[in-house]
Structures are given as structure tokens and as C-alpha cells.
Amino acid sequence: MEFKLKHKDGMARVCEITTAHSTFLTPVFMPVGTVGAVKSLDANDMKNELDAKIILANTYHMYLRPTSKVVKDFGGLHGFTKFDRSFLTDSGGFQAFSLSKNSKHFNEGIEFKSHIDGSRHLFTPKSVLDTQYDFNSDIMMILDDLVALPATKERVKISVDRTILWAKEAITYHKNMQNKGIGIGQNIFGIIQGGTDYEERKRCALSLNEMPFDGLAIGGLSVGEENALMYETVQNLNPYLDENRPRYLMGVGTPEDLVENVERGVDMFDCVMPTRNARNGTFFTSFGKFNIKKAEFINDHEVIDSTCSCYTCRNFSRGYLNHLFKAKELTFFRLASLHNLHYYLELARKMREAILNNSFTQFKRNFYHLRGK
């Protein structure tokens, strides 16, 4: 992976990242394709309508079904999905933690029950990389020990100890595998844990900074803490992160979260929010969000957002979308998802432009002004 820090405006950054499959600028938002597809959309939509340069797939789900061996047989995620740009795959640790009622965390790894058939599985620092080697993802995430917030100081310390231990195992294993010709062209990111505890976050960041990861992620946020505490945690980490590596805030978030955390030096984001909200009838716009199911939209001839150039806004009225949603027409999911993802990707583009023009502060002011804040 090639990484170039191109420009800074305060702590906000524009960087260029090149993987084996695409080059993209940050800040970047990565649409989430949990089971190898962004819900209701295909590779053509992602490339031709949205021009997404990188998307995320989930190791937990793809490991269980169809299994990594099946994906490998199709030539990895790129051959399986026909999306020939970059893939980032998470380690599956979050889903093992959140979807399995009886998951157990040990120093060896995470034991969990499949949400599909109840079978038992063990994720270890090595096994999740083996799975991601089969996927041939461009960016692989290591296994980390996530804790729900609020958590006791003792549990947070255990989480950081374990995450550092697993990071050492993962980076050593990855280097050994590359020496054997496996994982060539695949990059590995470490994950910083520590809850909202300043000292534990700092300890984890300093430890992982010493390891030769291609990038560093901030995990374990947006899991129950107040937004202000999330922003403070990210800002406090900034001095301890290597400036010459990508910074990825996992699972975040709202448009406001993106703006606030770009201001605090974050480069990469992913979240299911744009597509999940789309399926529930909620649209993101330059003036805020609204739900299309309201009766006031039945005879509305306007498009979702007159400033938007997405496929949906170029072609369809609020009245038509209101009808599709109420009729439970599957077409609605695609049209709504296209709009919301276009909004997120365009928000990232506008932030890049503002940073390059040294006008991010003004951009943020206008962003909130349009929302009446």
C-alpha cells in the first residue's frame, strides 16, 4: 500500500491511498457490504452510479456463509462480487461479540456460537487473518478485544492487554506468511482499544504505533457513549498516532460524526447507517434528514434534495418514493440506498475539497447552518 499525506487544514487531512485494486483520497466513506454486497445494490451500482473506490465486507458473516473457501474458489472477494476496486474486511470480532449471546473472550481468542445454526467457533489472531487471506481483501483488520461501554477500569485494561497481545501475534504471523508468498499485496491495520479511558487509549496507541502496521484504526467507539465523549477520545488520541499512516474510525457514523472526526484527524469511516436508514424510509440531505413515509409527501412533486445529483434525485419525486415505501416495493430499497450513499460519498468529497482549500472551518459552519444549528 502506498500512502501520501497530501494536505492538512488544522488536524483535518487529505491523504492518498493506493492498494492493489484502486487509488482513493481521504476523507473516505466506505459503504458496508456485510455479506459481500451492499444491501440492494450490486457492483455496477457501486462503480457506475456511486463511484465508490473502496467498500467493506464482514469476515464473521462471510466466514460462516458461504465460507472463506468458497470465496477463495471464485478468486477472492473481487472475483466473487465482481467489484474490482478495493475491499476492506473487518476481523469479525465485533459480530462475534454482538451477535453471539454466549461469546467468551480468552487470551487465545474469541469463542462464539453461530447465529445461523448454533455451531461453535473460535476466532484467533491467526485464524481471522487466514480467512482474510482467502478473501484477498486489500485491507485486513486484526482481531481485537472489544468491550461494551460503560465498562469497568479493570475490564478496559484487560481489553487493551489482550488487543496488544493479539496485535503482536497478528503482525508477526502476517510477516511470516508474506515470507511464504501468502498475503502479498494485502495490508494489515491494527486496532486501538481502551474505551473512553485516556490512559488506556494512549497505552494501546503507543504500543501499536511501534508495530509495522499499514494503518491504525480506532475501535470500540459508538457503542453506547455520548457523542461528546467519542469526539474527545478521538481528539486525545491524535498526538499518539503516526501521521504517515491512515487513521480509520470503525463503525461511525452520522454525517455530524464524520464532520467532527475529520476535524480531529480521522481519514476513513464505515457505517451501515445510510443503507439501514434508507430501508426504514429515512433520507439524508444537505438540510438534515427526514422520513418519506409521512403523509405530507403523498403529492409532493419535488425530489428528495434539489442540490443532489444522484440517480434517485435525477429521476424520481418524493411522492413516488412515498408510494414505493408504503407499498413495500423492493425497488424502494435500491433508490433510497443509492441516494443515501451518494450523500455520504459526496459529503466526503466536499470535505476533501474544503481541506485542500484551507476552508474546513467555514465548511463545518455552513454544514451546521444548513441544518439550522
From Swiss-Prot:
Q: Tell me, what is an example of a GO biological process annotation in this record? A: tRNA-guanine transglycosylation
Q: What class of enzyme is it?
A: transferase
What is an example of a Pfam family matching this protein?
TGT
Q: Where is this region: RNA binding?
A: 251-257, 275-279
Keywords, alphabetical: Glycosyltransferase, Metal-binding, Queuosine biosynthesis, Transferase, tRNA processing, Zinc
Question: InterPro entries this protein is in?
Answer: TGT (IPR004803), TGT-like_sf (IPR036511), tRNA_ribo_trans-like (IPR002616)
How cofactor binds (record note)? Binds 1 zinc ion per subunit.
Which parts of the sequence bind substrate?
90-94, 144, 193, 220
Q: Cellular component GO terms, alphabetically?
A: cytosol
UniProt pathway annotation: tRNA modification; tRNA-queuosine biosynthesis
Q: Which Gene3D superfamilies match?
A: Queuine tRNA-ribosyltransferase-like
Q: What does this protein do?
A: Catalyzes the base-exchange of a guanine (G) residue with the queuine precursor 7-aminomethyl-7-deazaguanine (PreQ1) at position 34 (anticodon wobble position) in tRNAs with GU(N) anticodons (tRNA-Asp, -Asn, -His and -Tyr). Catalysis occurs through a double-displacement mechanism. The nucleophile active site attacks the C1' of nucleotide 34 to detach the guanine base from the RNA, forming a covalent enzyme-RNA intermediate. The proton acceptor active site deprotonates the incoming PreQ1, allowing a nucleophilic attack on the C1' of the ribose to form the product.
Protein name from the UniProt record: Queuine tRNA-ribosyltransferase
